[in-house]
């Protein structure tokens, strides 16, 4: 089975019972889980001091255990504080041989983007310990797609997407929309041309989602891509003031401005049902009336 190494670079794990349930669920399945002490750390709202959380990341360059899945405990906030002090060069060098399979989402997007920007390091945007493996019930779709991505050098995700008939090919990248916005103009924002940009978020009103997408558009980032895929935007319910304005309104307005395809409907993000995407891998997107396919390759996988 597999070895999981936990890291907690972001928010304090307030749901300790869920973290313990996630560890138990993984061990019951025959996996080994290391570095479990990080789940109890706390300094203010963070999962430990800056020094402790930074060491979670920098120590990965010295991690010698082979075939290891590095799993973020949770998101929240905290990764942005660490970006200037992460030893990116050492992490990039480490990933060039026997790469760790690094997985997380939400606030962790900042670290994933930094690794991609500094050395084209591929990481996995997917489930985390508390929210997913530690849920009351582990979602079967999420579990299947996690192992699908980590065990197969080439795999395909299928869904019924909304958008124009299209075919696009390029580097798959993105993650949490708010975190990408926070990186614009910094050394940790990947400079990817002709890519396939995939985005998701949580607890953002539709007008805030639109404002962030327009910031990417006005910054020239969206027009430089081959395609955009939008995942879930949990907790984005409009109110009476919106008078019919909703996420579909956002998508329609963006499509009126973009000359590239925008495809929606992917189960990707903060919901219990989510795919796992290797950010930085090669992807081919096909969208037709019959459905949508995203074929991904070129990412590190577990050695079976």
From Swiss-Prot:
It catalyses: N-acetyl-D-glucosaminyl-N-acetylmuramoyl-L-alanyl-meso-2,6-diaminoheptanedioyl-D-alanine + H2O = N-acetyl-D-glucosaminyl-N-acetylmuramoyl-L-alanyl-meso-2,6-diaminoheptanedioate + D-alanine. The keyword Protease applies. It is found in: Cytoplasm. GO terms for cellular component: cytosol. It is an enzyme of class 3 (hydrolase). The keyword RNA-binding does not apply. GO terms for biological process: cell wall organization; peptidoglycan biosynthetic process; peptidoglycan turnover; proteolysis; regulation of cell shape. Pathway: Cell wall biogenesis; peptidoglycan recycling. Keywords: Carboxypeptidase, Cell shape, Cell wall biogenesis/degradation, Cytoplasm, Hydrolase, Peptidoglycan synthesis, Protease, Serine protease. Disruption phenotype: Bacteriolysis during the stationary growth phase. Cells lacking this gene also accumulate UDP-MurNAc-tetrapeptide, an unusual compound that normally is not present at significant levels in E.coli cells. Its EC number is 3.4.17.13. Inhibited by beta-lactams containing a D-amino acid side chain. The active site is at 106 (nucleophile), 200 (charge relay system), 270 (charge relay system). One of its GO terms (molecular function) is protein homodimerization activity. It holds the Pfam family Peptidase_S66C. PANTHER family: MURAMOYLTETRAPEPTIDE CARBOXYPEPTIDASE, MUREIN TETRAPEPTIDE CARBOXYPEPTIDASE. Releases the terminal D-alanine residue from the cytoplasmic tetrapeptide recycling product L-Ala-gamma-D-Glu-meso-Dap-D-Ala. To a lesser extent, can also cleave D-Ala from murein derivatives containing the tetrapeptide, i.e. MurNAc-tetrapeptide, UDP-MurNAc-tetrapeptide, GlcNAc-MurNAc-tetrapeptide, and GlcNAc-anhMurNAc-tetrapeptide. Does not act on murein sacculi or cross-linked muropeptides. The tripeptides produced by the LcdA reaction can then be reused as peptidoglycan building blocks; LcdA is thereby involved in murein recycling. Is also essential for viability during stationary phase. Belongs to the peptidase S66 family. This is Murein tetrapeptide carboxypeptidase.
């Amino acid at each position: 089975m597999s070895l999981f190494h936990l890291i907690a670079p972001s928010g304090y794990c307030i749901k300790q019972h869920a973290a313990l349930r996630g560890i138990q669920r993984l061990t019951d399945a025959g996996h080994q889980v290391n570095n479990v002490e990080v789940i109890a750390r706390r300094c203010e709202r963070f999962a430990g001091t800056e020094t402790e959380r930074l060491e979670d990341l920098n120590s990965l360059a010295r991690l010698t255990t082979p075939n290891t899945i590095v799993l973020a405990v949770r998101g929240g906030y905290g990764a942005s504080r660490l970006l200037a002090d992460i030893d990116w060069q050492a992490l990039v060098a480490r990933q060039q041989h026997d790469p760790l399979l690094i997985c997380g989402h939400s606030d962790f997007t900042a670290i994933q983007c930094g690794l991609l920007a500094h050395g084209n390091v591929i990481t996995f945007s997917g489930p985390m310990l508390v929210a997913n493996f530690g849920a009351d019930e582990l979602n079967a779709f999420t579990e299947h797609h996690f192992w699908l991505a980590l065990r197969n050098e080439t795999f395909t995700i299928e869904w019924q997407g909304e958008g124009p008939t299209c075919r696009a090919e390029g580097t798959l990248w993105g993650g949490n929309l708010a975190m990408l916005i926070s990186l614009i103009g910094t050394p940790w924002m990947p400079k990817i041309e002709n890519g396939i940009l995939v985005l998701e978020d949580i607890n953002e009103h539709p007008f805030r989602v639109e404002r962030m997408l327009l910031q990417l558009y006005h910054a020239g980032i969206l027009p430089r891509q081959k395609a955009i895929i939008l995942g879930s935007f949990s907790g984005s319910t409009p109110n009476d003031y919106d008078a019919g304005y909703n996420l579909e309104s956002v998508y329609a307005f963006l499509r009126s401005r973009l000359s590239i395809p925008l495809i929606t409907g992917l189960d990707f993000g903060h919901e219990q049902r989510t795919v796992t995407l290797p950010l930085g891998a090669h992807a081919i997107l096909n969208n037709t009336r019959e459905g949508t396919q995203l074929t991904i390759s070129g990412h590190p996988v577990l050695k079976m």
